[in-house]
From Swiss-Prot:
Binds a second Mg(2+) ion via substrate during catalysis. This is Enolase. Pfam families: Enolase_C, Enolase_N. Its main location: cytoplasm. The active site is at E205, K335. It comes from Leifsonia xyli subsp. xyli (strain CTCB07). Its EC number is 4.2.1.11.
């Protein structure tokens, strides 16, 4: 393996036109690799700190020159000479250099860019694809794509409270077949929306953002689109939600569909939805601080539904350990920029899987062409990936990378399919 010779960084744009950090790492053997950092719209209060400039006269305060400078002036010089293959040592050195609990001094966006670029450089130097370098010789499982095809909440300007309505092609035989099913359903939905005179404009993650009366209307439209595309709702293509309920939680109540609801009332709502629609997964059904509500919900419906903690856990092993102890969820959403280093991300996935939980690798609403999470999904044997609709090139880039990985694996490739959702009884 080769040592790190130099680290560079620059300010680039994400899919929402906001600045983000891109890092390049040069190794002593001449290898040059780069990584770009995503950014979220609905962010958990406990996420690692995203360092922005705050200068309203430049990019409306969202510039990342401070984070770029942190890479160039502090992080780079501190890790030069380290072996690129010593990922944990590199990441721990950055954490120590930052010296804060939430990476506020150097910025999680600066640290993550370096962490991912180092991993890519090590893989490139070893002449291995990233999924193989990180996952070892047994990495061979392609994830089920959780495709967000109707956007609401913080990802769209509509009257729908739930942030994401997803389709999951669990009945397909291969990843490429599952992707095709999702694409055909997506186009079927677009035609259906047009026929009903509804808006076909896109939200941040490539899904449609029609004005609808209520959340169930979105589920009904998707079910109809699945059938019109020639697939069976439930057994071939199931449904998933990201409620992002922290966005409408205030003073101990959920302001949902025009009513103030308790955690128990939200739990009853989800139970009713699951009884009427083929739901396999609900993300952030309750708020990030409602530990008691989460534990109650998991006890009520966790045996038949995947309950995913995003804002609840923020990819943080410490918060995940608390959730495991309280039995607050049965799955974790994994976003690399929530925690800020690859090592901590992999630690969170490992802890979840050892504890009998599932893990879902996820993009952010502000993405780039970087495809790292596609490789991570295969490397960690997560069996699930959430990376938007099959539209907008920053989303499609991840799907295309998974197609390449499937092709490279050849006959060894296995599609997770229904096995990724062992609790689903439909």
């Amino acid at each position: 393996m080769a040592a790190i010779e130099a680290v560079g960084a620059r300010e680039i744009l994400d899919s929402r036109g906001n600045p983000t950090v891109e890092v390049e790492v040069l190794l002593e053997d001449g290898t040059v690799s780069r990584a770009a950092v995503p950014s979220g719209a609905s962010t958990g209060a406990f996420e690692a700190y995203e360092l922005r400039d705050g200068d309203k006269g430049r990019y409306l305060g969202k510039g990342v020159e401070k984070a770029v400078d942190a890479v160039l002036d502090e992080i780079g010089p501190a890790i030069e000479g380290f072996e690129a293959s010593d990922q944990r040592i590199v990441d721990e050195a950055m954490i120590e250099l930052d010296g804060t609990d939430n990476k506020k001094r150097l910025g999680a966006n600066a640290m993550l860019g370096v962490s991912l670029a180092v991993a890519k450089a090590a893989a490139d130097s070893a002449d291995l694809p990233l999924f193989r370098y990180l996952g070892g010789p047994n990495a061979h499982v392609l994830p089920v794509p959780m495709m967000n095809i109707i956007n609401g909440g913080a990802h769209a300007d509509t009257g729908v409270d739930i942030q994401e309505f997803m389709i999951l092609p669990i009945g397909a035989e291969t990843f490429s077949e599952g992707l095709r099913w999702g694409v055909e359903t997506y186009h079927s939905l677009k035609a259906l929306l047009k026929s009903k005179g509804l808006n076909t404009g896109l939200g941040d993650e490539g899904g449609f953002a029609p004005e609808l009366e209520h959340n169930r209307a979105a589920l009904d439209l998707i079910a109809e689109a699945i059938e019109k595309a020639g697939f069976t709702v439930g057994s071939q293509i199931a449904l998933g939600l990201d409620v992002a309920s922290t966005e409408f939680f205030e003073n101990g109540v959920y302001r949902f569909e025009g009513q103030d609801r308790t955690a128990a009332e939200m739990s009853a709502y989800y139970t009713d939805l699951a009884n009427n629609y083929p739901l396999v997964s609900i993300e952030d059904p309750l708020a990030e601080d409602d530990w008691e509500g989460w534990a109650h919900l998991n006890a009520e419906i966790g045996s038949t539904l995947q309950l995913v903690g995003d804002d609840l856990f923020v990819t943080n092993p410490k918060r995940l350990a608390q959730g495991i102890q309280q039995k607050a969820a049965n799955s974790i959403l994994v976003k690399v920029n929530q925690i800020g280093t690859l090592t901590e991300t992999l630690d969170a996935v490992s802890l979840a899987q050892r504890s009998g939980m599932t893990a879902v690798l996820s993009h952010r609403s502000g993405e780039t062409e970087d495809t790292t999470i596609a490789d991570l999904a295969v490397a960690t044997d997560s069996g699930q990936i959430k990376t938007g609709a099959p539209a907008r090139s920053e989303r499609v880039a991840k799907y295309n990378q998974l197609l390449r990985i499937e092709e490279e694996l050849g006959e060894a490739a296995v599609y997770a399919g229904r096995s990724a959702f062992p609790r689903y009884q439909g």
